[in-house]
Amino acid sequence: NELIDSVGILKPFWEKLRMLRLGIAVDTVRIVHVGDSHIRGHIFPETTGGLLQRTFGALSYTDMGINGAFCTTFTRPDRVADIAALHPDLVILSFGTNESHNRRYNSILHYRQMEELVCMLRKSLPDVPMLMTTPPGSYDSFRQRRRRRTYKINPRTSVAVQTIRRFADA
């Protein structure tokens, strides 16, 4: 895993965590993790949130995942309002798996959908940094003769990863 923050957007967040760790900060640091079934499954977010809480103490880690979600799933005003109501210090956006499973995946459309979601979140949370994650590797399944299934690496996942990285770097 690699965390890229070439312009230092996350510096204020890291400073809040540092102050929390030193016992100087009294406010709870709030992280909201938004995404698809990887987030909805709770295993990764609960493990991450628990580790962060044990390490830093007064930290709230809320996951908002929806099975089968795309970026556009969260562009509804009520969903953006739900995220904003949590008053996060950091928003983590984890999408791309479901987008890349579409055999007609369109990176331009995916980019625009990310742009729409981030613009909506920026209006409600103008000073909150956003961290974008990329999807894990996945497989496409194919039915062969005699109803046997075979699997091969989904080639669209790497395109989705490149699209997300390009968007995050813009």
Feature map (PLM): residue ranges:
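Surface-exposed alpha-helical segments enriched in charged/polar residues
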Residues: R18, C119, K123, Q162-R166
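Structural motif
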Residues: G23-I24, I83, K123, R166
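Conserved SGNH/GDSL esterase-like catalytic core that processes O-acyl groups on lipids
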Residues: T28-C119, P126, Y139-S141, R156
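Substrate-gating cap/lid alpha-helix
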Residues: S138-A170
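Membrane/wall-proximal cationic-aromatic binding patches
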Residues: N1-H33, T75-D78
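Alpha/beta-hydrolase-fold catalytic nucleophile elbow
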Residues: S94, T133-T134
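Short glycine/proline-enriched coil/turn segments at helix->beta-strand junctions
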Residues: P126-D127, D169
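Proline-centered loop/turn at the N-terminus of a beta-strand
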Residues: P129-L131
